[in-house]
Amino acid sequence: MKRLTASLRLLTSALAMSLGQVPAWAQSAPASAAGPVLSLQLNAAQPSERDCRLTFVVNNALGADLSKAAFEIALFNDAGVVDRLTVLDFKALPAGKTKVTRFDLAGADCGKLSRVLINSATECTGVQPAACMRALKTSTKTAIAFGV
């Protein structure tokens, strides 16, 4: 009986140790293999003369060129109230490319901007119209909340 107990303990230990090493085929696929993604990052918000300049980094990993991509955004002030709605036109976004685009928002105060909300894709030419919103992944490098 002692031999059986010792053998079971040894077998249990070996099994527990082997579970820590997952074979490559069982590991998660990289994010790029998860499906098409249109990454949009709010990279900076800087005051300019009478304006707030928003800088975006966009990466088109949809697998197709976009001849035009534009999004309606809502800007929220520091009280959480919508200040305005506007459309940002990112123009052409080639497949597999990263692009930096800046927009000067006349009369906007960067210091009072608390949130940028993407309402909808007003243009998404090159893929199915809903693909730009469905595959959109947002992030921010600023203190301003950014997303859908």
What is the role of each PLM region?
Residues R9-G20:
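Bacterial N-terminal signal peptides
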Residues V82-K112:
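Intrinsically disordered, low-complexity Pro/Gly/Ser/Thr-rich segments with frequent PxxP/GP/PP motifs
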Residues Q21-A26:
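Sec/Tat signal peptide C-region and signal peptidase I cleavage site
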Residues D65-K68:
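Short acidic/proline- and small/hydrophobic-mixed sequence motifs that coincide with surface turns
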Residues G107-V148:
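Terminal connector regions
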Residues Q27-D51, T55, T142-G147:
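Low-complexity, acidic Ser/Thr/Pro/Gly-rich terminal tails and inter-domain linkers that flank the onset
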Residues L75-T86, V127:
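Short aromatic-acidic-glycine turn motif
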Residues V58-L62:
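Asparagine-centered strand-capping/turn motif at beta-strand->loop junctions
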